[in-house]
Amino acid sequence: MIEDVEITDNEFLRQFELEIGDNMARIEYALQDRKIFLTKYEMPEDLEDQGFRDIFIKAVFDEVRDRGISVMPTSPEVVGFL
C-alpha cells in the first residue's frame, strides 16, 4: 500500500531517503541543538505523480517527532506541506 513506506536516515549524507523501485526521493537536513532544519527536497516526477510527496514528508515529520526534535522546515516544498 502506498501509505506503508519506509524511510531511511542517511546520517552520513544528512538526508532522509525514500526508495521506490529505481527512484529515490530525499530531504536534506542540518541538525543544530535539538532542532532539525529540513533544507532541501528532491523527488523524481514519477514519484510525485504517484502521490508520494505528502506521504514522504509526513513520514519524515513522524520520524523526527518520535526523536523529540523540533522541526524547522526551510525547503519551500516542506513548508508548503504544512
What residue spans do the PLM features occupy?
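Conserved N-terminal entry element of GNAT/NAT acetyltransferase domains
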Residues: 1-7
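A generic local structural motif
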Residues: 4, 24, 57-59
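Structural motif
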Residues: 10-12, 32
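A short, structured beta-strand/loop element
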Residues: 17-46
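A generic "binding-loop/recognition-motif" signal
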Residues: 23, 77-78
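Conserved acetyl-CoA-binding loop-helix of GNAT-fold acetyltransferases
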Residues: 49-62
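Conserved GNAT acetyl-CoA-binding A-motif
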Residues: 62-77
